Amino acid sequence: ASHELKTPLTVILADSDVLLNHSTESISSQKKWIDSIQSEANRMRKLVENMLFLAKNDANRIEISMQNCSLSDICFHCVLPFESIAFEKGIDLIDEVEENIEVHGNESQLKQLILIFLDNAIKYTPSGGKIYFKLAKIQNKPVLTIRNTDSYIPPEDLKHVFERFYRVDKSRKYQGGAGLGLSIASQIAQSHKIKLSVTSDEKQGTEFTLNF
């Protein structure tokens, strides 16, 4: 965890040094460094929030209010903002959401859970790839699947994907993730008694399945 915090701090300090050394220049001419500081600060904020969530969860200090909510509506609202992101990256986001599917749970946490998987799929799908997002009832039980093509996870890594700070591709640290997202998803799933599973195939890609 200390290493994950140290990286953005190092960037912020380096960028602020550049600004201080060019203090007579206009703000517009130094926008690149200011944007970098803001980006790294936001990255730190997200990391701290995620670490606090996991710490509270470990200490059983998270109070969750459960109620009936529309999983269909939650999925729809989660997918919507990713459509433009996928378009910009040259990714085909194909969603199929069955209507009127309800579950008992915490709407905010369910949204966070789904956003983690969508963000993960976008992050690891290259341009020209596809993401399949599907919500349907199977044997009268809601099942959500998120599959992204051109993204293969070897068997030796697959069993670790829900562990904290674990990255399958160590070379992708620059993408800003801290390896906490799927761990948080796993904790939320446990609190909602959702069964998580993942499969990966070199031809078909990687698929996460959530059985409600």
Question: Predicted segment positions?
Answer:
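Short acidic helix/loop segment immediately C-terminal to the autophosphorylated histidine
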Residues: 20-27
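Short alpha-helical segment of the dimerization/phosphotransfer core of two-component systems
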Residues: 39-44
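Conserved catalytic submotifs in the C-terminal HATPase_c
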Residues: 65-68, 87, 92-102
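Short beta-strand/loop element within the Bergerat-fold HATPase_c
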Residues: 128-140
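Short conserved segment of the HATPase_c
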Residues: 153-165
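Conserved glycine-rich
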Residues: 193-194
